[in-house]
């Protein structure tokens, strides 16, 4: 959890993006002045410019109209997103789901940040889209598990015995013992 301090948010997210390929944050996307995460996210890529996401704008209109609520400028501002993000429409609420992709120049490796609404059912509702996006951008090879039972030999002796074989395994294959 990070407080509502723009600089602390920027520093925390920068630190996390330097050490992780994927960072997922929730909250701070609402229409009120204390919701400052969007401004911090806009700053990360080095730009503070915004655009209106027309799909999210329509969702804002549809949700508020269906509830019989007045559509205020403050509500419409929720469809305003940093220029550098991709938007996954949030069909469950008015706050957009934003995706920021950074090349290795920015944080030393490619990194992706997902910003989800803080309303729990909206964040949970976004997970299928987020997981699909992660799978398409971060292909994961199959995980194969094989259990081999040994007895009568210490772990260190076994490690020494198979050391040369283990050192020659493909780079994406690892042993755990």
For each feature predicted by the language model, list its residue ranges.
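Helix-rich terminal scaffold detector
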Residues: 2, 12-15, 19, 25-27
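Short, contiguous clusters of charged residues that form electrostatic/catalytic patches at enzyme active sites
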Residues: 7-14, 79, 160
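Glycine-rich beta-strand-to-loop/alpha-helix junction loops that act as flexible
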Residues: 25-33, 117
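An accessory alpha-helical subdomain
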Residues: 106, 111-177
